[in-house]
Amino acid sequence: MIVRTTDEITGTNRDVAAEHWRSKRIILADDGVGFSFHETTIDANSVSEFHYQHHVEAVWVVEGTGTLTNHETGEVHPLRPGTMYLLNGHERHRVTCDTTMRMLCVFNPPVTGREIHDENGAYPAAVQAS
């Protein structure tokens, strides 16, 4: 059994921040359960581009409002608490936040925690944990 709190993750290598977002990576590949689980917060009035070419991501919005743009189809979806989106086709997408948004995210395959978004907003296929 694994039990963790976000308080004990804060300020560690599981607490990853970029210009407009912060991700507390609660479960990672080295936990050996086949997925990773993150709490991600994205700043109000920000736009973030992502493209997970090697991962499927499920996202559950728990706080805040914004929009999700699917760059493959041009569709725009409202985001608010209770909204889930699944990137099962590795879609290039944009998250535009009207207010600060907090989301719970599951990745498969699991991330190691060492990944860095590249210029396309993607993670590499595999990164060795250290």
From Swiss-Prot:
<dbReference type="Pfam" id="PF06339">
    <property type="entry name" value="Ectoine_synth"/>
</dbReference>
<dbReference type="InterPro" id="IPR011051">
    <property type="entry name" value="RmlC_Cupin_sf"/>
</dbReference>
<comment type="pathway">
    <text>Amine and polyamine biosynthesis; ectoine biosynthesis; L-ectoine from L-aspartate 4-semialdehyde: step 3/3.</text>
</comment>
<comment type="similarity">
    <text>Belongs to the ectoine synthase family.</text>
</comment>
<dbReference type="GO" id="GO:0033990">
    <property type="term" value="F:ectoine synthase activity"/>
</dbReference>
<comment type="function">
    <text>Catalyzes the circularization of gamma-N-acetyl-alpha,gamma-diaminobutyric acid (ADABA) to ectoine (1,4,5,6-tetrahydro-2-methyl-4-pyrimidine carboxylic acid), which is an excellent osmoprotectant.</text>
</comment>
<keyword id="KW-0456">Lyase</keyword>
<dbReference type="InterPro" id="IPR014710">
    <property type="entry name" value="RmlC-like_jellyroll"/>
</dbReference>
<dbReference type="GO" id="GO:0019491">
    <property type="term" value="P:ectoine biosynthetic process"/>
</dbReference>
<protein>
    <recommendedName>
        <fullName>L-ectoine synthase</fullName>
        <ecNumber>4.2.1.108</ecNumber>
    </recommendedName>
</protein>
<dbReference type="InterPro" id="IPR010462">
    <property type="entry name" value="Ectoine_synth"/>
</dbReference>
